[in-house]
Structure formats: C-alpha cells, structure tokens
Amino acid sequence: MVRPGDRRPMITDHAIVVLADGGARALTHQAVDRHAGLPAGSTSYYFRTRAALIAAVVERIRVHSRTAFDNAQAQSAGPVTAEGAAALIAGQLRNLTGERWDQALAVFALLGEVREQPELRDALMRCLFSVDLA
C-alpha cells in the first residue's frame, strides 16, 4: 500500500506514462487515476487542476533530468575534452532514448500545452538541453 505522503511523486510518474502513451489530450485526472490504480478523484485531490498536474509533471521531469545529468557529469570527472563531452552527450541521449523514453515523449507531448506559459515551457526545454551548462 502506498503511503499518502508518497502519492504525489507516484501520481506524476503515472501521469508521465499517460502522456507518453496517449499524448497531451490523454492527460486527465481520471486517466491518471485509472493508470495508477487509484480510487476515482485521487489525482484531483493532490492536483486540483489540469494545470497543476502539468506543472507537477514538468517539475518531476526537470528533477529527473537534472539528476541524470549531474550523475553523468560526476562520472566524467577531470578536465573537459572533446572526447569527454561527446561521451557525455552520447550517454545522455542513450539515457533519454532508453530508460527515460517515457519522459522524453511526455516532454514533447507537453510542448504544445505550455507554449503560452514561459516558465513551464523553459523548464521543459531545460529538460532536453541547458544552454547554461553547454
């Protein structure tokens, strides 16, 4: 049984899969409840609006992206070389098209949803590429 304190991350993880499987139009509170096997109304209890759910999904993906990049960067300690940078980028792409594939699909599904919301749009774009860290 999932403890209530653990539900927000679990719900956002299921929302990511709903987005990956069905696109932005598939993302509803009911769809996330069904996918997560939660009682009806559970997702809307934690995220009252679709906008709140989308913001939570963007934040969840952002945290995963940042953690994955930080871990990869830590493994390639030492001076930055062209070969090292290429290996880091290749590793990130393998990660994004492998274990984080659902997150990548969710990012692209949400781009249209957040086009008029600069903060969320920028956060989504930073999940794919950070100019500051390039």
Regions found by a protein language model. Name each.
Residues M1-R7:
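Short, Lys/Arg-enriched anionic-surface-contact patches
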Residues R7-M10, H14-A56:
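Helix-turn-helix
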Residues P9, D13, A51, A55, ...:
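Generic detection of well-ordered alpha-helical segments
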Residues M10, H14-G22, T67-N71, Q75, ...:
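Solvent-exposed, amphipathic alpha-helical segments
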Residues A56-E59, T67-A104:
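Hydrophobic alpha-helical connector segments
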Residues A86-L133:
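Short secondary-structure transition hinges
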